[in-house]
């Protein structure tokens, strides 16, 4: 049976289809990192302070955290091909708008459009892959295809900042927006050539039908919950009491509404009954926090506590990107998840211990090792959490579930940034890094215990 599945995997996923998925999925991570070197020239060119320019990064994160599951739900309602193409078109519009933007307001609008557009790629791609695999009768997840989708994010996270730096240096900051037009065109062309049209609907897509099946109230409450939660995280170490209260109230209202909704935005009842899926979201959030905290905190500590320049400190993140890619490749054709997840969570504990033992008076071996081990966490977490989701989610709900997985990852990455702010505060010290390390190690132990006790993993 396994041999038959292997032979049928190739025609189910031709190269043009895989290339379309790579470009569609890659739009999101490349836009998350490409602009990292642009806030300074933007603030100078538009005569705004640097703090306001960084809103361009926050705007995309907030939009994506909400738009990913929304795009997944839309893929299930109107079809993944339509959503995939619409997302690429939105990215092109956002790129043009940002490239010609005369002020910060237009730039923020551009980033919201880009965030919404890039959020369509991954959930739609997962639904497209699932439907193709189901049609071909594949008994196991198409692990190679899923690993490719995971590696796209890993590679672009690594190359995004230097690529953005080159674009800004040689073509100006507006090129980081204009590049979306070219990538959007390529995505649409590949999609038209390789993605089959969506099936015709039994019902007419009227406004009332659309609103009823999208669950607008559920979406609104979800958006309020996530927005308030991210504001709480981004305001740390100061706790925003108002946003904290809004988060709790909106979450309770969201759960209560979804439990009684005819077509819930998120099937809370099924999610509560499926502990494995819930644990997968939580584990992805924790492990991404453990990996991203190295990306955020280590360069900051190296620059402020060890007095390295930005160019040298950035080199310490290279092992992370290399190991993450190798780790993801190592399990590309292996559908097992239990052992890789246990290694992933154990590596997170090791990352925390390494950070807790690192000193500005010591050698560079420990921070370099911490970066490499964090790459192991990043690579294994991205690939295995995706495989677990593919196995656990019903075909008709995999779009929304894929979006929720991405939301979990966004919360983890923002949590990592907030953790750095809590322990570093106004002065970056060895003690702050040690506090971050201890916290990461404790969270890693919790993730490891949850993985060991999860008997659904294999």
Predicted regions located by residue number:
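Membrane-interface helix caps and helix-loop-helix hairpins in membrane proteins
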Residues: 104, 233-238, 333, 361
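Transmembrane-helix bundle of Major Facilitator Superfamily
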Residues: 2-199, 422, 426, 436-439
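Hydrophobic transmembrane-helix bundles of small-molecule transporters
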Residues: 147, 153-155, 169-283, 290, ...
